[in-house]
Amino acid sequence: MSRFIKGMDLSTLLELERCGAKYYDHGKERDILDIMRDYDVDTIRLRLWNDPYSETGEPYGAGCNDLAETIAIGKKVSDAGFGVLLNFHYSDFWADPGKQIKPKAWKDFDADQLEQAVYEFTGDSLRKVLEAGVNVTMIQVGNEVTNGLLWPEGLKPNYDNIARFISSGIRACRAVKPEIPLMIHLDNGGNNEMYRDWFDHYMERGEDFDYIGLSYYPFWHGTLQMLEDNMNDMAARYGKELIVAEVSMGYTMEDYKQYEKLKDSERKGYATKPELVAKIEYPMTVQGQADFTKDFLNRVAHVRDNKGPVSYTHLRAH
């Protein structure tokens, strides 16, 4: 029987603690993990980058989620009673549909070498994470691999290599601990045509897996109805469980320049641009965020055939 998972990505937890971050619940300062638990969060998503440092050893930031940092966060949240969704990016920094850059150590590898490197890195990392006592309850093999991974060898439409690389990670996970469920994750959760095309190609070539993961950002990915329709179709077409691995809705249009310590040339502007806000069905307010979240949870909880009531909601703070 499917269960409904509520999750939060806390990959920057320790970095923010080192920066002095504080968290509040109705105006009262509290520990972030206590807040999450009291609001029924049960799973913490943690990304893993291969080598998030420059050639001179400077950290890239954004959590600096190498294996040591990921284990440290994973142990902390596991000790607090949470499960961990371990998210392999197979890159030294952010991997998403716009960039899937090979790790520096793999930059000259051909497809055969990449396949082997994925297997070894995945298996070795997972063993160390588990040996440290991290409660891994799910694994994500690649991050938003809509356009492939490990470019250029794994760039869409080279589905043969895409399937090779993902399948290598899947085999490594199964070899270490076969009972941990595995997810393949794409972005653009409202785009049914894209999901059908991608998974039709993969199913012809790749290793079996357990969950289809989706990202859904209303500014880019269509309406909630489009998300629901796509999830229903994925459940019927492939018989997989479904997880919304990333979702976000802001609550303010305030320009945060006054809070940043950046030069004007380094700023990216508003958290959410006005032209994007105009595309969504909810106002960018505290109540609008609450209404969106309630409607989102209600829709993903009622996907057909008992495949959809599983949702990892990555409620990103903006």
Residue ranges and their predicted role:
Residues 1-28:
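Boundary/entry segment of secreted carbohydrate-active catalytic domains
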Residues 8, 87, 139, 212, ...:
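Conserved, mostly hydrophobic/aromatic
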Residues 31-39, 45-93, 159-176, 231, ...:
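Aromatic-lined substrate-binding rim segments of carbohydrate-active enzymes
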Residues 32, 181, 202-275, 297, ...:
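Glycoside hydrolase catalytic-domain groove-lining segments
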